């Protein structure tokens, strides 16, 4: 819940699997990001049909034709044996030595968008969606083990600030370190930063 406005995503919105029927019933969704808008308009349904990603919609309980936010989730893992030693130490810092391994189960936030109509109103919809995901995968109802939430966050100030505010950390401390790991030249754009959240931490 947002303390300032009293908006509570679990009360003031309804979570639904994002299907073509939901998309048809609701008003067109836009978060003013062309790539995200196109994904949610078309690709989200293809990912779902191929079991590659599942998208969820939060619609306004007072007006169910209005989509507040969308998120696409997929299974993933952090392959510790393939990352640099400094990044591996950063990742494993809170894991006991006896439980450290070469792979750690994770859930990937593939896409996350908040409707332009509901942004910048103090509702904190994006952060409340993140909180829902954290609680969902910590819950005893979760059918598989999952240690981390991971995201390839757009490498811009607003997006990085959002995920940092919600407890995510960059796997690589610097862009230079991440660029070197990815084999990018100095002039190549680093379009995303890999960030993680440890579900064992509160």
Mark where each language-model region is.
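Non-catalytic substrate-recognition and accessory regions of acyl/acetyltransferase enzymes
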Residues: 1-121, 127-128, 135-150, 160-202
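Negatively charged, flexible loop motifs adjacent to catalytic sites
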Residues: 156
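His/Cys-centered metal/cofactor-coordination and adjacent catalytic loops
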Residues: 153
